[in-house]
């Protein structure tokens, strides 16, 4: 290290000698030393600060002569560094932090045994650590002369700190909280045994804890003189509180709820044994509990004089309620449902043994249950006079229904399907032993089942006069069908496939013993099988 100044001095003398020989004025010795020192500092800054990380860090740092408040055993401990070396490490974080730190002469409110305990640091060292967090926090803290409402045994208990030290810890959270707290003279509605029980605090201390949550809540609470509809044994039972204390707890939820509640003089349709049974409450107490849900629900309910289509043994059976009580329960769901229901005089196509069987209900009661699903379905159904193509043994077999009853069940699916079906006079290419075999149906009945899939398929099929390249023993073998019947099955897949196939006059590169060997087919018959899939495949490309 002692050699460096000597080398620097020797370099300076050499520069002076060279300048004298060339006849140029010699540079100032002071300027040369300053330049050398700035370069050394810049190099040191790059080593310490990571070099080019910040533009401002290239100037001589005012931090370099600052002593930390304390020392950290582990220099990778962010919390300790945050407290002890705040002037050093965090000094460059903000432009304003370059002025002398106001933190240095601040004493903490209390002391923490563990300097990495964020909750304790938040309370005791709030002025020190969090002081630079906000611009406004640079003024003398209003927290210093504030006494907490009560004391906490555990200073890391967030719920207790939230209640007792609310003015201290959360005081700086909002600008408005700097005025004298309106909470200090408020008495709770009741007392909680467990101060961390959020449900109890929500009910009893609502004016105290939640008072600052909304601007409007600063006025005298309208809850204080409200009596609940009934009493709950368990004050943490949300369903019971929702029903009995609705005016008390949920009263401040909406602005409109501040007017006298229209629920108070409403009698339920029926009674529920279990007040936590949501389905029963939905049906019997709909006018009471769900009455405030929508603005329109404040008018007299149109449900009150409606008789259900049938009766359900189990009032919590959603499927049965959906069918029998549709006018009652789902009546308020849509605005249009307030008119007399068109379902009432409709007879089902057939009868279902199991009223929860969605497939059967979809087919037999389509006009009844699904009638209100779409606006267009209110006209007389075109399904009623349509005979199926064939009959299914299992009415829940979707594949069979898709083929045989296509005109009946799927007829209303698309607007275009209301015209006479072009399928009715079409003969299949071949027959399938298993009507649920999708591959066979795809090949033999392609014109029948898939004919309605695309608009273009309504023209005469170009497949009908095409002979396959070869024959497959197994008509469900997709690989064989892909090769032999490519022109037939895949012909309709793309618009371009309607032109004469370029495959027909193409000879394979080689032969495969096993026509289901995908690797061999991929190499030898690439021009045949993949020719239509990718136009870039050609003999030149294959070499």
UniProtKB/Swiss-Prot annotation:
Start and stop residues of the Sequence repeats: 51-90, 91-130, 131-170, 171-210, 211-250, 251-290, 291-330, 331-370, 371-410, 411-450, 451-490, 491-530
Keywords annotated in UniProt: Cardiotoxin, Disulfide bond, G-protein coupled receptor impairing toxin, Repeat, Secreted, Signal, Toxin, Vasoactive, Vasoconstrictor
Signal peptide coordinates: 1-23
Family annotation (InterPro entries): Endothelin (IPR020475), Endothelin_toxin_CS (IPR019764), Endothln-like_toxin (IPR001928)
Tissue spec. comment: Expressed by the venom gland.
Main location: secreted
Protein name: Sarafotoxin
Organism encoding this protein: Atractaspis engaddensis (Israeli burrowing asp)
